[in-house]
Structures are given as C-alpha cells and as structure tokens.
Design a protein with these regions (language model features):
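Oxidoreductase and adenylate-handling cofactor-binding alpha/beta cores
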Residues: 11, 83-97
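A short, charged, Gly/Pro-tolerant segment at domain boundaries
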Residues: 94-119
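E1/E1-like adenylate-forming module used to activate ubiquitin-like modifiers
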Residues: 1-80, 110-111, 115-120
Length: 120
C-alpha cells in the first residue's frame, strides 16, 4: 500500500514519537520462476533519518506493473515478512537480544540472504 494516505500515517507516527515497522514485498517473474525482495523498515524515536535520506519507505501509488500488484499472493513470503517484522518489534522492546540494532533488513529470495543496514 502506498500513496498519500500512507504518507500521512507515517508523518503522524513520527510526529507523535511512536515507533513503527513498515514492510514491503516486491516480486518479479523471470524464466518461469519468481524472484524478489522482502523489506522490513523500522522507525524509532532514536533513528528516523534513514526513512528520508535513503527512501526506505515507498509512498508511490501502485501502478500494477510489478508482478505482486497483479494479485500474486505468496503466503510463505507474506508470512516470512510478517515474522521478521514481529521479531524486530520484540527486539525493540527487549524480548530478543539485538546486537546489530538494524533499522532496515532486506531478504532476497534467490540468494536466501538477509542484509541488515541503518544501524544505530
């Protein structure tokens, strides 16, 4: 989901000092198989600069040109994205140890890689 409504929600959360996590999923079809990236972006009072400086959250309106927008629903990828977001949320509140304190994480499907960035 994108667009102006999402921008307003994010701006209000930032204004009120509320931490939040935004997730995204992009997939593409290539040679009869899907590839793509899952994204988990965390915003806290201590670290919000990466939201603007690195455009970590998309506010674009979906144009329907990517394969995910064409109603490809991949339950396992949606579940993984949600699980990674919940794990990060629990790290924020001390339930899990957080050595890297990353505020951005990307999972690439084809390489099975987790990449962390935007550490405190």
């Amino acid at each position: 989901d994108g667009g102006e409504a999402k921008r307003l929600i994010v701006e209000k959360l930032v204004e009120l000092g509320i931490p939040f996590i935004d997730v995204g999923l992009g997939v593409e079809l290539d040679n009869e198989s899907l590839g793509g990236i899952l994204r988990i972006t965390t915003s806290t009072v201590e670290n919000r600069e990466h939201l603007r400086s690195k455009d970590r959250i998309s506010f674009s309106v979906e144009n329907g040109n990517d394969d995910y927008s064409k109603n490809i629903q991949i339950a396992d990828l949606n579940a993984l994205n949600a699980a990674l977001a919940v794990i990060k949320w629990k790290k924020l509140f001390g339930f899990y140890r957080d050595l890297e304190k990353e505020n951005f994480c990307a999972y690439t499907i084809d390489g099975n890689s987790l990449i962390n960035d935007d550490q405190l």
